[in-house]
Amino acid sequence: ANRILENQATVDGLTGCLNRRGMENRLDEVQHGFGRGGVSERITLVLFDIDFFKQYNDTYGHLAGDDCLKTVASIPRSMAQNSKDFVARYGGEEFVVVLVDTSLKDALVFAERMRTRIEQLGLPHTGSRISQVVTISVGVASAGNCDNDATNLIKCADEALYQAKGAGRNRVAYMSDQGRVVTL
């Protein structure tokens, strides 16, 4: 019974991903698993959201929106290689992928593959101003390039995501080791 309650408290019922609370718990576990209380330099956070998702819901309805969220979430879940990696629904149409023991370079390859695979799903999206299919914008940050805690890692990834959106969406941006956001 306790396991069921814990699962309900930490897993998003729609997508099967961790929810925000579950993500914070797992990130804390990973963080403390490396000792010293700081985030490992080998943790990379990939933050993404679905471009023009509100318009998607307005165009196709909330049931279709739910199906879109489930389908999009399944892509990074199927791509995660390391048993310590995890995917969480951060809120609304925003998701986080935490890649453990992954360099920034490898995380960027992961992010671009994920972006491409989601676009190639071909989910129709006539409400999008950039494409006729569902796309995502992605921000990537590595613990080695941000202040050494989970809150700052998320903040760095969010800055990169904001830059990806500002550069036209449907792209990946990342926080460089010089503290600048670079768009691919």
Question: What is each of the regions a protein language model found here?
Answer:
Residues 73-77, 106-125, 158:
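Alpha-helical scaffold within the catalytic cores of cyclic-nucleotide enzymes
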Residues 44, 137:
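Cell-envelope/extracellular polymer assembly enzymes that use nucleotide-activated donors
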Residues 6-25, 48-62, 70:
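Conserved nucleotide-binding and Mg2+-coordinating catalytic segments in signaling enzymes
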Residues 86-89:
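A short pre-motif secondary-structure segment
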Residues 4-7, 20-42, 73-82, 100:
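Short regulatory alpha-helical coupling segments
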Residues 132-134:
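PAS-family sensory domains
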Residues 100, 104-112, 128-129, 141-184:
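Catalytic-core segments of nucleotide cyclases and related cyclic-nucleotide turnover enzymes
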